[in-house]
Design a protein with these regions (language model features):
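Extreme N-terminal leader/targeting segments of oxidoreductases
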Residues: 1-35, 50-58
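Short gly/ser/thr-rich secondary-structure transition/capping motifs
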Residues: 15-23, 45, 216-221
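Hydrophobic Val/Ile/Leu positions in short beta-strands of Rossmann-like dinucleotide-binding domains
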Residues: 37-38, 62
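Glycine-rich Rossmann-fold phosphate-binding loop(s) that bind the pyrophosphate
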Residues: 40-45, 65
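Glycine-rich FAD pyrophosphate-binding loop
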Residues: 52-74
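Dinucleotide-binding Rossmann-like beta1-alpha1 core, especially the glycine-rich loop
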Residues: 77-159
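A short, glycine/Asx- and small/polar-enriched loop/turn
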Residues: 126, 156-170, 212-220
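Helical element adjacent to the flavin cofactor pocket in flavoenzyme catalytic cores
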Residues: 174-226
Length: 226
C-alpha cells in the first residue's frame, strides 16, 4: 500500500486523478480465518485494524452485509469528547480522544477531525452545580475543562438567546476546547484502508445468516456468500 502525501496528490492531480490505486481490495471469502468480525462499521474496522497492527493477527475477515460504513457509522452525531462525570468514563473517553488526535497520522488518511470545542449549557443553579462537578472530575484526571460564566459563553456563541426571560435562560456552561467532530465516512474508509494494508480481508455484500457451533463454542459462520 502506497502512502498518501502532498507529492502523490500533486502527481495524481496532474494525471487527472486517474492513477489512484484502490484504497482496499475486494477479495473473495477464504474457506477459513483465524478471526471473523461481523459488521464493517467503525467498531468492526477499528477492531480489525488494531488486531493486525498491535497483535499481528492478520488472517482476519470483516463481513459486512452492505457497504463499509453504511450502518450506524453513517448515522451518528460525530461528536468527540471526554467531558463525563464518572472518573472511569472520563479516563476511557480521554484515551479515545488522544487516539483521535493522532488518528489521521496513524492511518495516513484524513479523518477530518475538527477540534472546535463543546459547550454544555447550564439553565439553572442546580445544573451549574452538576457541570462544576463534572469539570472538577475532568481536571482531577488531567483533562481540559473550563466553567464559563454568561459573558464568556456569549463570546463563544453570540447568537444564543441570552434574555433572562428565555424559556431556558443561560446561566453558564462547561467548555471542553479539545472536543470536536470527525467525518464518519472518512473514519470508516481510513480504518478500512489501514486494515487492508495489513492483509485483512474486507468482504462487502456478505450477510451473516447463522453461526456454526461445536457444543458451546462458535467455530464458523454461515453467510450469503458461503
Amino acid at each position: 500500500m502506497s502512502r498518501y502525501s502532498v507529492l502523490s496528490l500533486l502527481k495524481n492531480a496532474v494525471g487527472g486523478h486517474k492513477g489512484w490505486e484502490r484504497a482496499w481490495r475486494d477479495p473473495e471469502p477464504k474457506p477459513e480465518y483465524d478471526v471473523i468480525i461481523v459488521g464493517g462499521g467503525g467498531h468492526g474496522l477499528a477492531t480489525a485494524y488494531y488486531l493486525a497492527k498491535l497483535y499481528g493477527v492478520t488472517n482476519v475477515a470483516v463481513l459486512e452485509k452492505g457497504y463499509l460504513g453504511g450502518g450506524n457509522t453513517g448515522r451518528n452525531t460525530t461528536i468527540l469528547r471526554s467531558n463525563y462525570l464518572a472518573s472511569g468514563n472520563t479516563l476511557f473517553y480521554e484515551k479515545s480522544m488522544r487516539l483521535w488526535e493522532g488518528l489521521s497520522q496513524d492511518l495516513n488518511f484524513n479523518v477530518m477531525m475538527s477540534q472546535r470545542g463543546q459547550l454544555n449549557l447550564g439553565h439553572s443553579d442546580a445544573q451549574m452545580t452538576v457541570l462544576k462537578r463534572r469539570g472538577n472530575t475532568m481536571r482531577l484526571n488531567g483533562i481540559d475543562a473550563d466553567i464559563l460564566d454568561l459573558e464568556q459563553v456569549r463570546k463563544i456563541a453570540p447568537y444564543f438567546d441570552y434574555s433572562p426571560n428565555a424559556r431556558f435562560p443561560i446561566y453558564g456552561a462547561l467548555w471542553q476546547g479539545r472536543a470536536g467532530i470527525a467525518r464518519h465516512d472518512a473514519v470508516a474508509w481510513g480504518y478500512a484502508r489501514g486494515a487492508d494494508g495489513y492483509g485483512v480481508d474486507l468482504i462487502q455484500n456478505c450477510e451473516v445468516t447463522g453461526f456454526i457451533k461445536e457444543g458451546e463454542k462458535v467455530v464458523g459462520v454461515e453467510t450469503t456468500r458461503g
